[in-house]
């Protein structure tokens, strides 16, 4: 059986109609001679269908197959069960080697050099006139050499075989040698494959336990299911690919057929070599014999070697590697990151028992591997003293806590680019933050799986006498399956996808399209399905230990939640909400019963959604009974009440506290000063009266007395007051005069007295050297300016001008000592208010408050974050 891209069965051979009912054309590989392939039949029909013509070889093959059962009976009667089992085991190993090594070598040379075809041409095996009768031949017509007789015999035998096998209308000499060689090659394939199958079945039959109690159990039920599934795989595969791909036809000639992916080829890569061998494991379950299981594993593994070293190289030479631009997108992103960031190196990745991309100059790599080595050595050296209960708790808590940490990072990164912002604000690059994430994620995987391996190993070691060998091997197979899934996933999505690169470097994505190559052609989320089978394998290995079941459930749930509630919403946001149906989904929905169930579920879902929508409408119906503008009037009344409360002046005609131009401007953008006009009856005025600036939210609880400190945001009403508090009060008092009835003045709050924080504020006039409130101003708003961020130069210009006015800039550097109210936090808030980026205090101190560096850094971060949007 051959393959293309993944298998020939999936590409060139994927013709779902019978070759006899459609006009399929073929051409030879080297000479490009076109022809119409003859009608052929599958292996079973060719050998056992009495309505079809049989050649001599086919009769011999059928006889050899049937004779196996008589030989089995005779050997069993004469030598006993054990000898018979080993006798057929040796036979199976012989035919398996003949299959994978023998046929493999023949196909290897046929693929590279067309050895069989050239041999047939050289010796005129399928010609009317043999070479020894050709005038140009070097052979003498009277030669009696053994070689001549041998090839004449081969010529006559092969021609007789084809004539006795094919219909009368088949013209042997009208077809090119390639098709005739292929027809003869099929005969030997039939012999090897049928003998391989029959000897294996006899060996398994002899290994089945005699006790009915041992046969009728859950293992046998599962085994029968796997066998039936295996039969369906084989039948459906032949339905799709026909004999051409089944017998490696493209090693001899090429069919011109449409590419149709159907049936079993939508479920698994290389289905004939992967799920096509599940029957092996079904029979092993029924036998409950680890020896049968080991033989099955050997047969399956040798088939994968055949695929790797024979079929795949041929397919790549003949059809290319089957990759397209979409499948290479993530790989190109990895290359682009390396190209644009000279200090970037590929991350350390743990794959099974190996580490990839180890960098001897990267400390985190040593830390990761050192952690694994320390844990393993510690477990081995202290195996007798480790309390398994404490170790279980350690594994459980480590997995849960680290998963919560990882999930939180991914969720916040998806929502607000939190992780990237954290590093950008501290002076690092976007790619550097991604590198740190790569270390964190890989370390999380390495740590949790190392602890799981240690715990499972100690569980097996402490209870080895009760461990079932077959369960142990099946568990290891599941571990191998998960390792394979991880490797295939990484191969399909590259390092960029493996480390959730679209969460951190979405600006590197040029094509917003999800890959459907490799394992993602069959499963949408392989990591959620096959990514935990190895953990369930530990359940088998430990004979269904409760603690391992708990850990397996934890692994499964955390995987599911991460994919369902974090990864999938983010993918929809980045690539669009397109429903991608996997190959497995297509095949299952193609089955009528499952399609009907799916339709029923969809209808139920629509009914539930409709009922919820109707309920929501009914619950909102009460609001329609209220006046149309009821809610608007309610909000307006609240605003009026607050305004009335804020104006807390006494009922004296000379009590006044007003902000200049308050009718025009209620929002003061810093560094604009706020000028306050006040008036007080002369009998109430005290030279120690003072005015404080407060946040409304801090003082609204008490209108008669201020119970919070002003924090230095206050001014005297007279230049002669509070002389020991410095000159700033004299500078803020810009005017004061007295008449017979009242005293009035003007106070200006500039950047030396104002808050540098967005909010609603009010002024309070206090009596004497106390906190008794006499007057309260109308609330007003103070806000930080929005600087020009069109270019980094304009942003720097506006920033330096503002800092100069606030008196915190010296020699181009931020110096907070110039204004005690404008500190590092105020600068951070100013930048965030203008450009939406928050730099860390540590970073600004690291660059010595350089306004040029800070402004350009903030602008660069803004550009980076915008590109991620």
Curated annotation (Swiss-Prot):
Q: Does the keyword Transmembrane helix apply?
A: yes
Positions of post-translational N-acetylserine modification: 2
What is a GO molecular function of this protein?
phosphatidylethanolamine N-methyltransferase activity
Q: Which biological pathway?
A: Phospholipid metabolism; phosphatidylcholine biosynthesis
Q: What is this protein called?
A: Phosphatidylethanolamine N-methyltransferase
Q: Which domain of life is it from?
A: Eukaryota
Zinc among the record's keywords? no
Q: Which reaction does it catalyse?
A: a 1,2-diacyl-sn-glycero-3-phosphoethanolamine + S-adenosyl-L-methionine = a 1,2-diacyl-sn-glycero-3-phospho-N-methylethanolamine + S-adenosyl-L-homocysteine + H(+)
Q: Which family does it belong to?
A: Belongs to the class VI-like SAM-binding methyltransferase superfamily. CHO2 family.
Which stretches are Lumenal in the membrane topology? 2-55, 108-187, 234-258, 311-362, 411-439, 485-534
Cited Gene3D superfamilies: 1.20.120.1630, 2.60.40.2840
Task: State the InterPro entries in the record.
Answer: Phopholipid_MeTrfase (IPR007318), Phosphatid-EA_MeTrfase_fun (IPR016219)
- The encoding gene is CHO2
Protein's membrane topology:
Multi-pass membrane protein
Pfam families recorded: PEMT
Q: Name one GO biological process term.
A: phosphatidylcholine biosynthetic process
Predominant place of localization: endoplasmic reticulum
Q: What does this protein do?
A: Catalyzes the first step of the methylation pathway of phosphatidylcholine biosynthesis, the SAM-dependent methylation of phosphatidylethanolamine (PE) to phosphatidylmonomethylethanolamine (PMME).
The EC number on file is 2.1.1.17
């Amino acid at each position: 059986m051959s393959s293309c891209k993944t298998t020939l069965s999936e590409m060139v051979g994927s013709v779902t109609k019978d070759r006899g009912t459609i006009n399929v054309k073929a051409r030879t590989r080297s000479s490009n001679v076109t022809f119409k392939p003859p009608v052929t039949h599958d292996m079973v029909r060719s050998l056992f269908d009495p309505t079809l013509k049989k050649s001599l070889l086919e009769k011999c093959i059928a006889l050899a197959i049937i004779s196996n059962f008589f030989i089995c009976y005779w050997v069993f009667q004469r030598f006993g069960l054990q000898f018979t089992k080993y006798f057929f085991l040796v036979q199976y190993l012989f035919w398996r080697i003949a299959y994978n090594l023998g046929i493999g070598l023949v196909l290897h040379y046929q693929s590279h050099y067309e050895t069989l075809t050239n041999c047939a041409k050289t010796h005129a095996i399928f010609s009317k006139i043999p070479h020894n009768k050709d005038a140009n031949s070097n052979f003498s017509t009277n030669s009696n050499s053994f070689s001549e007789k041998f090839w004449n015999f081969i010529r006559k035998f092969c021609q007789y075989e084809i004539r006795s096998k094919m219909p009368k209308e088949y013209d042997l000499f009208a077809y090119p040698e390639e098709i005739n060689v292929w027809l003869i090659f099929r005969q030997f394939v039939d012999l090897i494959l049928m003998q391989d199958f029959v000897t294996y079945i006899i060996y398994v039959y002899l290994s089945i336990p005699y006790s009915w109690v041992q046969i009728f159990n859950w293992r046998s039920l599962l085994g029968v299911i796997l066998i039936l599934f295996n039969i369906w795989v084989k039948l459906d595969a032949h339905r799709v690919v026909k004999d051409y791909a089944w017998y490696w036809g493209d090693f001899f000639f090429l069919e011109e057929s449409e590419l149709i992916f159907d049936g079993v080829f939508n479920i698994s890569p290389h289905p004939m070599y992967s799920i096509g061998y599940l029957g092996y494991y079904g029979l092993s379950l029924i036998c409950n014999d680890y020896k049968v299981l080991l033989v099955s594993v050997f047969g399956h593994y040798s088939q994968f070697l055949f695929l790797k070293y024979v079929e795949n190289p041929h397919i790549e030479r003949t059809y290319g590697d089957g990759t397209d631009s979409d499948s290479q997108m993530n790989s190109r992103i990895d290359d682009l990151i390396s190209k644009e960031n000279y200090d970037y190196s590929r991350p350390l990745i743990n794959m099974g028992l190996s580490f990839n991309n180890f960098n001897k100059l990267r400390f985190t790599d040593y830390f990761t591997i050192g952690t694994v080595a320390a844990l393993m050595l510690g477990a081995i050296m202290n195996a007798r003293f480790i309390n398994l209960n404490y170790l279980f708790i350690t594994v459980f808590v480590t997995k849960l806590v680290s998963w919560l940490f990882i999930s939180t990072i991914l969720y916040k990164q998806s929502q607000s680019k939190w992780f990237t912002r954290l590093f950008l604000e501290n002076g690092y690059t976007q790619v550097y933050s991604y590198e740190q994430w790569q270390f964190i994620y890989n370390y999380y995987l390495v740590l949790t799986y190392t602890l799981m391996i240690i715990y499972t190993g100690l569980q097996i070691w402490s209870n080895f006498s009760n461990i079932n060998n077959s369960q142990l091997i099946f568990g290891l197979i599941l571990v191998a399956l998960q390792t394979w899934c991880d490797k295939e996933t990484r191969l399909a999505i590259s390092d960029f996808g493996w480390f959730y690169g679209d969460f951190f470097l979405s600006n590197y994505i040029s094509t917003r399209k999800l890959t459907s190559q490799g394992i993602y052609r069959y499963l949408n989320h392989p990591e959620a399905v096959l990514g935990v089978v190895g953990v369930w394998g530990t359940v088998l290995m430990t004979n269904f230990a409760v603690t391992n079941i708990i850990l397996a459930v934890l692994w499964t749930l955390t995987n599911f939640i991460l994919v369902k509630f974090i990864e999938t919403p983010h993918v929809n946001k980045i690539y669009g909400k397109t429903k991608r149906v996997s190959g497995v989904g297509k095949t299952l929905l193609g089955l009528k019963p499952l399609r009907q169930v799916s339709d029923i579920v969809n209808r139920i879902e629509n009914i539930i959604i409709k009922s919820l929508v109707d309920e929501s409408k009914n619950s909102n119906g009460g609001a329609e009974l209220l006046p149309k503008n009821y809610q608007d009037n309610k909000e307006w009344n609240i605003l009026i009440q607050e305004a009335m409360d804020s104006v807390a002046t006494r009922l004296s005609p000379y009590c006044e506290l007003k902000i200049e131009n308050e009718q025009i401007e209620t929002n003061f953008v810093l560094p604009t000063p706020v000028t306050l006009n006040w008036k007080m009856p002369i009998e109430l005025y005290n030279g120690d009266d003072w005015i404080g600036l407060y946040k409304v939210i801090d003082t609204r609880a008490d209108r008669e007395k201020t119970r919070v400190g002003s924090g230095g945001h206050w001014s005297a009403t007279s230049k002669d007051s509070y002389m020991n508090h410095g000159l700033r009060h004299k500078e803020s008092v810009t005017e004061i005069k007295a008449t017979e009835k009242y005293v009035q003045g003007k106070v200006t709050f500039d950047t030396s007295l104002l808050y540098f924080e967005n909010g609603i504020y009010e002024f309070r006039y206090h009596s004497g050297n106390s906190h008794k409130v006499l007057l309260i101003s109308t609330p007003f708003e103070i806000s930080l300016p929005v600087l020009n961020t069109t270019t980094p130069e304009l942003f720097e210009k506006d920033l330096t001008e503002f800092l100069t006015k606030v008196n915190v800039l010296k020699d181009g550097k931020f110096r907070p000592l110039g204004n005690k109210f404008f500190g590092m936090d105020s600068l951070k808030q100013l930048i965030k208010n203008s450009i939406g980026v928050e730099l860390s205090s540590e970073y600004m101190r690291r660059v010595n408050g350089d306004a040029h560096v800070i402004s350009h850094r903030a602008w660069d971060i803004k550009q980076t974050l915008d590109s991620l949007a």
